[in-house]
């Protein structure tokens, strides 16, 4: 028996299984009883059931700082036992899948993600738009580039776009904090990003309107986007911007407004150690390698380097929406704006 095995005599002899079950019937989240039940099942050779009770005890215990001191050693043992069983289970499942041809490097990425979820290595993230939800759309974190025939042509313009960016960056005041306060709206601290220049933007288009002075400074960038299916909604989109993240900055987890669009990133100035998360998937930016993602799925970003990171960021229609559906979405938002007396909507990319 390994050093992580449950004690065979001490606790279990003090409370038999019937007594443990009676306690759990009355108090299903009794941590001590859950651990004792797990120990009993482990001694009986039922590793799978024991694992579920150890996990239940860990969940019932709550945050470590709230656990009574005398219970902490037992919880540490429960965690060790659960992790050992989970590792054994994972090794078995992977062994069986490998025997049937599964290879993490070449097999279906969607299946690989489902495997990580079923093994408890990743959690499920779904669309949670903060403003408008269009039902029936697939839950995809990062989209496959093959769905966007215009993407390769845009990437070929990376150097020209980056040159225009460098000219803009000669005037740091051209960038403004991405998250800005509005006196007509309740304050929202945005986890420290409100009016924070660590995350800044230089807009070519903003909320469906061209920023003429800025666009005139970046003609190659504007030309490169001519064939892109931008999500055109009056007073709302597209927004096209250079998004700047200062050294050491972290954009906290957040969700976008509407799930009828996707966000595209074209990395332009990437020093390394710059990471982006959408749902349960992490990716590093690399210059000239664009991607599209659903921003209504929780996402966040880090610049862990000592240099500035800048990307070209814009929104496009989701490819699953028909032309009729796109037109109806536009009409809906126009009606909402008209009801508001023509006031500019509270909107962001």
Show which residues each predicted segment covers.
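Conserved metal-binding segment of the jelly-roll/cupin
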Residues: 284-298
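Fe(II)/2-oxoglutarate oxygenase catalytic core
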Residues: 30, 39, 43-241, 245-255, ...
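A short beta-strand-loop-beta hairpin characteristic of the jelly-roll/cupin
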Residues: 268-287
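Short beta-strand His + acidic residue motifs that chelate non-heme Fe in jelly-roll/DSBH
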Residues: 251-254, 275-276, 293, 299-305
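Conserved structural position within tetratricopeptide repeats
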Residues: 24-25, 59
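A short hydrophobic beta-strand segment most commonly corresponding to one strand
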Residues: 262-267, 292, 307-322
